[in-house]
Amino acid sequence: MPPALAVPQAPVLLPIDDVAAISWQGSAGAQSYIVERAEKKNGPWTEIGRNVCDAAVPYRPLFADADVQIAGQYFYRVTAQNSSGASGPSNTVGPVAVRHFTLVDEMRDFSLLHQHTGVTPETGKTRNAKEDMDRMKGAAGAALVYRLPAAIRTCTVYTFFAEEPADLRFQVSADGQTWQTAEARRKDFYSGEGQYGYWKPVRYEAKPQALQSRFIRIEFTGEAQISRIEITYGGAE
C-alpha cells in the first residue's frame, strides 16, 4: 500500500482588501481548505467555507464571503486538510471592512441567475480560455439577467472571444420591466494566441447611472464566453 499522506502545513493567507476576494498560498499535499471568519482577532471563529478547492478558479480570488454585514469588520484564517488530517490555522488577516456586498458568479451553472436566454454552460477547451474551467457560452441575442436585493453599484464581466470581440450590451432596471442602457468600459488583455491558441480576453465594467437599479441584463451581440461576473451592490458611495 502507498504511504499515507503527510498532514499538510498551514497555508499562508494573503492580504485582503475585499471580503469577496480572499486568496492564500496553498500547502503541498492539501486536498481542500476550510475558511473561517471572526469578528475579533482571537475569535470565536465561524466556519464559512469547507472543502474549498484552490485549483477551481485559476488566476482569480479563491473565496468570496457573501454572508457579511455592511460596515462590519472581520478577521479571516484558513486551514489545509487532506485524508490524513488538518493543518493548524494560517496567519490571521484583518480587520477587513465591508463597504458593499458582492455577488460573484463563476459560471458553473444557472443558480445565481434571475433569467437566462440562449446560453449554455461550457467546460471544454480550457487551455484556450487560460485554464478557466467554467464559462457561459452565447451568441447574438443571448442574455443573462441578475436580480439583486439592493441597488447595483458596479458590474464587472470577464469574457473570452474566439474571434474579434463583439461587445456585450448592458441594461439596468429598477423593476425588471423598464430598462435603460448602462455604459460600460472595455479593457482588452490580448497579447497573442501563443502556442496554445489563446482566445481574446476582455473585461467590461458597467456602472449604472440610474439610482436604485436592482436588475442588470447582459446581452451578447456575437459569439462570446463569459468566465466570471462580479456585481457589487448596497452600501454607501
Each language-model region and where it sits:
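Pro/Thr/Ser/Gly-rich low-complexity, intrinsically disordered linker/stalk tracts
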Residues: P2-G29, I70, G85-R99
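Extracellular carbohydrate-recognition regions
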Residues: G94-E122
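Exposed low-complexity, polar/acidic, P/S/T/G-rich flexible segments that act as propeptides
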Residues: M1, C155, T221-E237
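Conserved structural position at the C-terminal beta-strand
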Residues: A80, I218-F220
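Beta-strand-rich modules
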Residues: D65-G85
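Short beta-strands within extracellular/lumenal beta-sheet-rich domains
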Residues: N128-T154, E164-P165, P201
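Extracellular low-complexity, O-glycosylation-prone stalks/linkers
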Residues: A30-R50
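Conserved Ser/Thr-centered positions that define the repeating blades of beta-propeller domains
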Residues: A38, Q171-S173
